[in-house]
């Protein structure tokens, strides 16, 4: 299966539902969208005194998805955060479920992820209009 417009590049499953809410591309700088699917995990890997690496690669693989938004006004930031936060099954740990397009398999996969802290940097405040414009924001989904 290839990329499907209706599924989007990444979607969030609202908590308690079986539906998906795709993250609209208007919130993603597509050229800065990064997916690292099926990353290997090591446990207690080490180098010998000769410099030879001994790896203990686990069977479990994880995916990391990162993207940057374009400059967004506060209303768009709120809309994007609502999509993401509606997917939290645990608000304390920012845990939720996503569906994403995996380039390795050319198919969609589901993952239980957490969203690391998000940093907001203001570009401009228009006091007359009462608007805030934010610089690009980095969003990440990291699989458990």
Q: Which role does the model predict for each range below?
A:
Residues 1-144:
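Extracellular/virion structural assembly segments
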